[in-house]
Amino acid sequence: NVNKKAGKAIKQNLMRILFGRLHYNAESAGIGWVTVQRNEEKIKEVLTAAHTNDATVPDLQNHISNDVFIQIVNSVIRLIGNAYRYEGNPYDDEIFPRDTDAEFRNLKSKDPIRLYIYACCDKFGIPYERRNGRQTKMPNVLGQAVLDYLKAVGNKQMFLKPHTLKVRCVSLEEKGLICPNCGRVHLNLSAGICSGCFRRLDDNHTIQVEKLRSNTDLMINVVKGRPVCRLHSEELSGQTDNQGERQLEFRDIVRIKSQDSN
């Protein structure tokens, strides 16, 4: 029980840093971007699967490269994280994986992931059908390929498992793209589409990673070159008769059953 409680708190804090709002996330702070294992065989499989099963469906390999596909996957990961769809999220009684989440068609018409995928399809000339209305469930070959790839690397039902994620860190000399419309920072190229407002990104609006890091307190110790320091904490809990037991139970690191004489 203690391990579960401590593990959940660690995951929550880690994911909060990776997918936080405004300047408090990995990309906006100049740390890097969240990605998953790259498997070329799996990429080819998901890009061609729909066309192989139905020749009338577009062959995605004729429209996007593997590099662009991974950029799209990375941005969808960011959007999933922004929606708290990850293991150990603070709203796990409301946000959890469902069987219907495995299908792109079940996304709401205004879901950010759906809108981002549509913008990518428009840019790369991938045909798709789009309708308005809450009752209309529209599939999308690119969107489904992204979800299928995430499932293949351990993140099924559009729900992230922290142990499957990787962070591609950036150096001070690298640059990020800034959306000219909403100002969102992208260290991942995002296939040239903003994952915030779904407008086009361009090379005329960039920012140095060094400047990003100086603008947020998440990286203040790195920017100032401060050495690693030891964290010291004091007990602030109330006093009890049994000092030894109290010390062991402090911060729930070890739990002692009151009836256990040992």
Predicted regions and their residues:
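Helicase motor interdomain insertion/brace
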Residues: N1-Q259
